[in-house]
Amino acid sequence: MKKLLLAVAFTAMLASLAAAQQIIDPRVADLVQAGKIRVGVHSIMYTNDPQTGELRAASTGIILLDIARTLGARIGVEVLPVGHPTIPEMLTCLAVGACDMGFMGPDRSRGGVDFSPPILQLDYTFLVPAGSSIQHVADADRLGIRIAVVRDHASTLTLSRIFKHAQMVYAATPEPTFELLRTEQADAFASIRAVLLGYAPKLPGSRVLEDITTGPIFSAWRCRRVKLRG
């Protein structure tokens, strides 16, 4: 429900952008002139369809491209997804002007972009191996526990704010992050539930925890572009 309410609120903000399109809202004038919005998407949330090559969501609850397409439809421009394997690559895309917007968690170190208000809450949890004593997310915040995480991902930012004792073990993308767990270099793998459910069959006896922690997702815009604040 929280995801839906945030998405509805964000869509309402998009509607305000379209209200004055006859005189072209200055916040989107450059997008209208270009005729397109280039949207950076993180590969942990979207993957390439092996048959069509198109980007598709990792789960039905991920609606970031749908939000971008709503904006595109409101202002009458094409939406062009641009996939990035890592968040730093997406930030570079925004910084050099190769992307117009992207979606990511907030972080003070992410200069060079403007953030909207939060538009979604995503659910994060852990994949743990067979025989693990970790039954709940809070159980993992102990000295000596190693949590495999994707560097700079929103789930990693969320955990780093709330966990005080566990050690984060970083990898660049989900596949090597899972390998840290599979090769016993980590005690848990933290990510979006849908991603973890995809990896669980590759590690016999593993399980995805039932409880969750949540974190916000924001739209990030190239500086001096629209900030979507009403």
What are these regions (language model features)?
Residues 21-105, 111, 170:
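Extracytoplasmic small-molecule ligand-binding "clamshell" domains
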Residues 28, 54-59, 111-120, 207-211, ...:
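A structural signal for short loop-to-beta-strand junctions that line the ligand-binding cleft
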Residues 88, 103-114, 158-161, 182-215:
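A ligand-binding cleft/hinge motif common to bilobed small-molecule-binding domains
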